[in-house]
Amino acid sequence: STAGAGASSPAASYPARLAVELKQRFPNHAIAVLNRGVNGEETDQMMDRFSADVMAAHPQLVLWQVGTNSVLRDRSLEIHEAQLHQGIEELKAAGADVVLIDPQFAPAVNAKAETADMIQQIALAAKQENVDLFRRFAVMRNWYDVQHLAFADFVSPDQLHMNDWGYACWAKLMAGAIAEAASRPIASAAAHPAHATNLP
C-alpha cells in the first residue's frame, strides 16, 4: 500500500496525499514525506533496507506498515513478532518516533485465518514498545460495518489494496492524528503513554 499499489497515479498514493495533508496543517513548517515502500516485502526484507533507505535520511518520524504480506503468505507469527520488536528498537535507537500501521480490512486479508492474531500482535507490540499505532484495520472495518460502504468504495479491484478514495481518507486521518500528537504537551504525553497507542 505504501508503494502505491491500487492508486490510479503516484499523486493519488497514500504518501503523496499525506504530504499534501500535512503541509495544509503545518503551512509554516518544511515537511518532507519520503516513500520507502516496496510492494510485496515482509518485515525482515524491510529491515534489511533500514540502514540505506531509512536511517540514512535521519527521519524524525517513521510510519511503518507491517503484517499484511506475512499474513497473506502464512508466515510464522512467532518469527514475525521477534522481527517486529527488533525493527521497532532499531528505529527508536536511530532517534525516530515510530507509528505502526496494521493490515487493511480487505477481502484478501480477511480471508486469512491468522489476520486477527496479527492485528493483536501489532497492537501489543506498540503498547510494549511505547510507540504509536494507526489502527487501519479498525478504521476500514468501520467504513464497511458501520458506515455501510461497499468494498468497491475503498478497495481496488484486486481485493487487497486500497483505491484512491481509501488512500485519500487514510492520509487525512493519519495527518490529523499526527497533528493531534504534535500538539500534545510533552509532560502530558509522558504521563499518559497509553494514549499514544490509539491512532486515530
Question: Where do the protein language model's features map onto the residues?
Answer:
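Short glycine-rich His-centered loop
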Residues: 1-9
